[in-house]
Amino acid sequence: TRDFANNIGAEIMGRNKFGPQRGPWADYDWQGWWGDEPPFHTPVFVLTHYERPSFTLSDTTFHFLDASPEDALERAFAAADGKDVRIGGGVATVKEFLDADLIDTMHVAVAPIELGRGERLWTSPDELTDRFHLERIPSASGMVHHLFWRK
């Protein structure tokens, strides 16, 4: 679980993870939650119905795609230089890739708190055990890491 960035050559995320705007882009000055030094250090492909020009912050270039999971993954792999592609979230994006059967391994950290309403990835992680092996690793903080890998 500590090896989060090893061998990652590109990331795919949904628009909700990128920022709070919905609908057409009203503010092209918004460049994400993370400031001038994004934590990705790879190309990032943001899935959105409203494309906008790509831009670069530090060593991360953000590309905005209105694409299927298959097409987005093809673009990300082409940019990943032989490395893996991480599906970074949010929930709707992860579900799309799971539904398209495009996930090989997955690490989901679950905190023991309820923040109110939101999207659920699952009711129980056991829902995925028809396709994936599952190992649960608890931590002293109460966080449980769910590690999935394809059967």
Protein language model features and the residues they cover:
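Enzymes that bind and transform nitrogen-containing heteroaromatic metabolites
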Residues: 1-151
